[in-house]
């Protein structure tokens, strides 16, 4: 059973994560770190420095990148630019105003694809 741990964003850090705050919560039971950038509703982009640091922690990263196509200032960087051992959640629905269609996808390490295929087969069977 998963137990999420929230790490607060602080105004004095420009609402950016402090990597030391995250490290304090990592244990041998940590299954993954979940991030999203750009963040909704602020549009805040995670800094390259943070993405590099989070990728180097040795913990799988799940990155919600659904708003990457909706950045008007700066450049949204994917966690995949810093590690190939990450899961990226993205889709077409937000970017192309197709919200009713709910078209999404995951990019994952090759070693995890078979498990994801099994999960997908059980989630999307129509009776």
Say what each PLM segment does.
Residues 24, 78-80, 124:
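Short secondary-structure boundary/capping segments
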Residues 57, 82-84:
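Short, structured coil segments at secondary-structure junctions
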Residues 68, 72, 81, 118:
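Phosphate-coordinating loops and pocket residues in cytosolic domains that bind phosphorylated ligands
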Residues 9-74:
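Active-site phosphate-binding strand-loop segment of PLP-dependent enzymes
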Residues 6-8, 78-81, 88-90:
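Structural signal for conserved beta-strand scaffold positions within catalytic alpha/beta enzyme cores
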Residues 84-127:
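Conserved core segment of the aminotransferase class I/II
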Residues 1-4:
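Substrate-binding/gating loop at the entrance of the active-site cleft, primarily
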């Amino acid at each position: 059973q998963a137990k999420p741990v929230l790490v607060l964003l602080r105004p004095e850090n420009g609402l950016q994560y402090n990597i030391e705050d995250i490290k304090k919560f990592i244990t041998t039971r940590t299954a993954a770190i979940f991030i999203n950038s750009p963040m909704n509703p602020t549009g805040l982009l995670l800094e390259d420095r943070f993405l590099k640091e989070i990728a180097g922690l040795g913990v799988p990263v799940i990155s919600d990148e659904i708003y990457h196509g909706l950045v008007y200032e700066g450049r949204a960087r994917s966690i995949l630019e810093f590690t190939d051992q990450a899961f990226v959640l993205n889709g077409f629905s937000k970017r192309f105003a197709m919200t009713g269609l709910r078209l999404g996808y995951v990019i994952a390490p090759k070693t995890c694809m078979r498990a994801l295929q099994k999960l997908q087969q059980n989630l999307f069977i129509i009776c």
